[in-house]
């Protein structure tokens, strides 16, 4: 009998004003799930930046396979955030070394571009370690990219808010204007 393979899937950066939306996909076996839970894995939003960074090498080492996908700010503006998020998720899944039988997707976003089985799970990172692991990988990868972009655009304070719509970020956009990495469709009420 063929083993049933499930991939956890989560997105990061959906509500940001700057930069791409990222998605992580992770396939774990039961032993890897237990090991990650013992190491403190949970929803990336409930972990410190240091804890997330420390978990990444372990996730990559013991997962059956993992991948990250993204959609650019330009794609978000052209396609809308829903479709761009779906594209990032599909890209992550297609980059997996093994294609899963089912996707376990955090939230309520059904993937129209995926023709296999899928299950959306509200608060999925609290229920499925593979979703939590995908969340951590995507969050660390996106934050690292945005922090590198902070060096190119220091006036926006990106290292502090990683592109989200804080008062500091909104004030910087009002003062300095938008960059090519800002999501134009998200800025209509700021400029």
From Swiss-Prot:
Q: Which cysteines are joined by disulfide bonds?
A: none
This protein's major location comes to cytoplasm
User: Could you tell me the superkingdom of the organism this chain comes from?
Assistant: Bacteria
Gene3D superfamilies tied to this protein: Ribonuclease H-like superfamily/Ribonuclease H
Q: What is this protein called?
A: Ribonuclease HII
Q: Which residues form the RNase H type-2 domain?
A: 4-191
Q: Which organism is it from?
A: Prochlorococcus marinus (strain SARG / CCMP1375 / SS120)
Question: Residues that bind a divalent metal cation, according to the entry?
Answer: 10-11, 106
Question: Which GO MF terms does the UniProt record name?
Answer: manganese ion binding; RNA binding; RNA-DNA hybrid ribonuclease activity
Output the Pfam families linked to this UniProt entry.
Answer: RNase_HII
Enzyme class, broadest EC rank: hydrolase
Name the Enzyme Commission number(s) assigned to this protein: 3.1.26.4
Q: Where in the cell is it found?
A: Cytoplasm
Can you supply a Gene Ontology BP term from the record?
A: DNA replication, removal of RNA primer
Function, please? Endonuclease that specifically degrades the RNA of RNA-DNA hybrids.
Q: Which cofactor does it need?
A: Mn(2+); Mg(2+)
């Amino acid at each position: 009998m063929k083993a049933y393979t499930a991939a956890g899937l989560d997105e990061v950066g959906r509500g940001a004003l700057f930069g791409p939306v990222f998605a992580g996909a992770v396939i774990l076996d039961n032993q890897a799930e237990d090991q990650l839970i013992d190491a403190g894995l949970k929803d990336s939003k409930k972990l410190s930046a240091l804890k997330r960074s420390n978990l990444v090498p372990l996730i990559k080492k013991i997962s059956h396979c993992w991948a990250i996908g993204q959609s650019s700010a330009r794609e978000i503006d052209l396609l809308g955030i829903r479709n761009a998020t779906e594209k990032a998720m599909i890209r992550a899944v297609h980059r997996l070394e093994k294609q899963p039988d089912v996707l376990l997707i955090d939230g309520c976003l059904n993937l129209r571009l995926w023709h296999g089985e899928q299950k959306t799970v509200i608060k999925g990172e609290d229920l499925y370690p593979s979703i939590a692991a995908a969340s951590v990988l995507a969050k660390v990868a996106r934050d690292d990219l945005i922090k590198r972009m902070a060096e190119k655009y220091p006036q926006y304070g990106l290292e502090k808010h990683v592109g989200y719509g804080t008062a500091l970020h909104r004030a910087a956009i009002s003062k300095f204007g938008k960059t090519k990495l800002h999501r134009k469709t998200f800025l209509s009420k700021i400029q």
